[in-house]
Amino acid sequence: MKIGMMVNGNIFSYDGESSQAFEDSRNAFMEAVTATQTTQDSGCSCTREVLKNRVDVSRTKRYINGCIDDIMQDIKDGVLTLNIGDVVPCELTDGQKVVFEVTDIDENGYRLEMKELLKTMAHTDMQKWYDTFYKSLLPTSLKNAIIPTKREYKKDGDGKLVEVYAMIFAPSASEVFSEEEFDDNDWLGDRGVYEQLDFYKDWRNRIRCTVEDGKPNAWWLLSAIAGHSTGFALVAYYGGCSYSSATATWRAAPVCFRIRKSK
């Protein structure tokens, strides 16, 4: 099965089996994307066009010498209001510096997603890692701001609707991909569970890099493949949709959560 992505009229693809072909295609893809971009965000070597009106909170005068504690306190007090596309810097407890992007806003909270990919793992290991990430890597001020989020998915991708509550979670396929992409890939699970987020309508916002080498990598989604319990959808390194066995260990775990807005 060949999968690929077009940039400026050029198609970059690989056969899904050859690791060297994957590496060559990934490098060529990044060179093409880099050539089309003019701005590089902090925190990751992935380049991406900065959306109009997007704000890097750390570069505003009030927070240049501040930290995540100041940002969380001002959000709580209503001094700071975030918009979709804004970026919030954070230093994890192990010293790693990451960036969280605002991908959605609702009545009660802001949805933040980590731009970087910290660790690759099997889909079956994600929940255990999420628990560790929440308990051990998040600064206290950020951890205290996170609110439980109801997540819904269809059993085996197209079966009974299941509800769970989570502090850290992975996006659903229906939040990332469009109806047209579901039409073209009938194996995608969780169709209709959510609407596609505006943030993900630009495929460049789906590209994420690993901390280890700064290169784009595939990342897991919550959704199982339609009709299956052991295969899961993912975002490929080029921003398109793909899938893999739940035991594959070279896909990364995304980090997504919601923080409370000021009352």
Language-model segments: residues:
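Short, low-complexity, charged amphipathic interaction modules
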Residues: 1-48, 53
